[in-house]
Amino acid sequence: MVNLRKTHPLMKIINHSFIDLPAPSNISAWWNFGSLLGICLIIQILTGLFLAMHYTSDTYTAFSSVAHICRDVNYGWLIRNLHANGASMFFMCLFLHVGRGIYYGSYLYKETWNIGVILLLTVMATAFVGYVLPWGQMSFWGATVITNLLSAIPYIGTTLVEWIWGGFSVDKATLTRFFAFHFILPFIIAALAIVHLIFLHETGSNNPSGINPDADKIPFHPYYTIKDALGLLFLLLLLLSLALFSPDLLGDPDNFSPANPLNTPPHIKPEWYFLFAYAILRSIPNKLGGVLALLASIMILLIIPLLHTSNQRSMTFRPISQILYWILAANLLVLTWIGGQPVEQPFIIIGQLASILYFLLIILLMPLAGLFENYMLEPKW
């Protein structure tokens, strides 16, 4: 009898994607984050679905409905804590996944990389509209401040902001549409993730050495299924530890107060995973300039394949590029810290210097390091 998984129309697709898929024999734990992101998305969709059953997207009852979920719904507190902290896990895996791609030159699979950047932007949009839903102080003022940035667009800005708001301020219409967006976007993300995988399977996975691994491939199952299962175990350990022991560790205390348009919190700041971009936005003392820098901080990922100057794909054997890469990683941590600080000295100047260094490293220093390493390996003297 012919094996069903190799003949059945549906099973055949799953087989080619997750079972008999030829994978490089040397991919490290940095290659675990793709599968972990898939798990994160499933967790978020499931917990989100159960939250949506009890949530009401009305300005008068939204805050109360979230309190009701935590107090009265069976395991509602757990579902909410898993969903809120699941978002943090999602972004942690995302940043590590993108960081892996930059370090090992995975961005040279251009289609896969570009879909990945679109995925990152979509997840960021989903997280932003989701943060507004509990209708606490930081939800309301975060929505007001970030949507207001669009008013910096010349000529159409103000009209655009009022169109997104559905009125002249963030109100019931805004909350309702943000709930609708937050419900539909994860399914769009799931579809994009499938496209991401389709493009990846056109070329096969990259590996730490950066050289063609075709000469030494192993089946995905059981080797990488068991490896992914171990990664999942670590992810769940971290997520459950957060959700059960300190669920509010990464949240903002201001969000325990219901939204009040007449009372502005002293420090308006987004969740931790947006702080690096928020710091770049604030480092430019001009509204339009700040918005453009904010956009550029993410969109710069799209031009990274064009800035690859090295003869080697991966940074594994490129010490100068490695040093610059880890400076970039440290710089992003500094930006994250600055984004959570008030707008006063010395934080302003630190944020401005870190923002300049961020763009300088990606656009100039890392490509130059690649050229220098080429020269050192094949000197012309």
UniProtKB/Swiss-Prot annotation:
Heme b b562 binds at residues 83, 182. The keyword Transport applies. Keywords: Electron transport, Heme, Iron, Membrane, Metal-binding, Mitochondrion, Mitochondrion inner membrane, Respiratory chain, Transmembrane, Transmembrane helix, Transport, Ubiquinone. Binds 2 heme b groups non-covalently. It is a multi-pass membrane protein. Heme b b566 binds at residues 97, 196. Its cofactor is heme b. One of its GO terms (biological process) is mitochondrial electron transport, ubiquinol to cytochrome c. It is found in: Mitochondrion inner membrane. One of its GO terms (molecular function) is metal ion binding. Belongs to the cytochrome b family. Component of the ubiquinol-cytochrome c reductase complex (complex III or cytochrome b-c1 complex) that is part of the mitochondrial respiratory chain. The b-c1 complex mediates electron transfer from ubiquinol to cytochrome c. Contributes to the generation of a proton gradient across the mitochondrial membrane that is then used for ATP synthesis. Heme 1 (or BL or b562) is low-potential and absorbs at about 562 nm, and heme 2 (or BH or b566) is high-potential and absorbs at about 566 nm. This is Cytochrome b. It comes from Notoryctes typhlops.
